[in-house]
C-alpha cells in the first residue's frame, strides 16, 4: 500500500504532502515514509495494529488469525462491523450512518478488505525493522480505550520512531469521530508547524 501511495502522490502531483493515516492507514503511511521519504512531509498515524508480535482484539484479531480467507467469508460481516461502529454510529441513534458503515462491507467486501490486515503477520516484522530508520516527523494520535487495536501499538511506534510524539485521546477505536475536536486541533497544529518539533 505504501508503494501505491507513492505512485498516487506522483500521479496527482501532490509534492510531499502531510499524510493523515489512522487505523489501517498507519502501516501504509509508515511503509511510504520508509521507502519514499521524499514523498511525504509528515505523518499523523495511530490506531493501527502494527506491533510485532501482533496485539489486536475482538473481530480484528479473529480476522487476522483465521486459518483462511474462506473462514473470514463465513463471518457475519454486518454483525462484526455493526458491533465495531456502534459506539460512534449507533443503529438506533444514527441509523443512516450505521447502515452506511455496515453496507460498505456487504457482497463479500468484508472478506476482500480483510486481505489487507491478514498480511500483518508477515508485514509487521518487516515494518519493525524499518521503524528506527524513518526520520519523517510522525504524530501518533489514537484512542486509549481502543478494544480492537490496544494502546500498546501506539506506544510501540513512539518507542521505535525517532522523530515522533504521541497523543492519547479519551476515545475508542474511532478516535477521529469520538474525539473529533481534539483530533482535528492536533492535526491543524501539526501541519501548520508542529511537525517541525520532532
Predicted regions and their residues:
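Flexible "cap/lid" loop of the alpha/beta hydrolase fold
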Residues: 30, 34, 40-72
Amino acid at each position: 500500500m505504501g508503494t501505491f501511495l507513492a505512485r498516487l502522490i506522483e500521479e496527482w502531483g501532490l509534492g510531499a504532502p502531510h499524510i493523515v493515516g489512522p487505523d489501517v492507514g498507519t502501516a501504509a503511511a509508515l511503509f511510504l515514509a520508509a521507502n519514499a521519504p521524499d514523498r511525504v512531509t509528515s505523518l499523523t498515524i495511530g490506531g493501527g495494529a502494527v506491533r510485532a508480535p501482533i496485539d489486536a482484539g475482538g473481530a480484528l484479531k479473529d480476522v487476522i488469525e483465521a486459518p483462511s480467507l474462506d473462514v473470514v467469508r463465513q463471518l457475519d460481516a454486518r454483525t462484526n462491523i455493526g458491533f465495531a461502529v456502534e459506539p460512534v454510529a449507533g443503529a438506533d441513534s444514527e441509523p443512516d450512518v450505521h447502515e452506511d458503515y455496515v453496507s460498505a462491507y456487504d457482497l463479500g467486501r468484508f472478506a476482500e478488505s480483510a486481505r489487507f490486515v491478514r498480511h500483518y503477520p508477515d508485514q509487521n516484522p518487516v515494518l519493525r525493522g524499518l521503524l528506527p530508520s524513518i526520520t519523517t516527523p510522525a504524530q501518533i494520535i489514537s484512542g486509549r480505550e481502543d478494544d480492537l487495536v490496544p494502546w500498546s501499538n501506539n506506544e510501540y511506534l513512539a518507542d521505535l520512531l525517532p522523530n515522533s510524539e504521541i497523543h492519547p485521546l479519551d476515545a475508542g477505536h474511532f478516535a477521529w469521530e469520538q474525539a473529533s475536536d481534539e483530533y482535528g486541533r492536533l492535526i491543524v497544529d501539526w501541519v501548520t508547524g508542529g511537525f517541525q518539533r520532532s
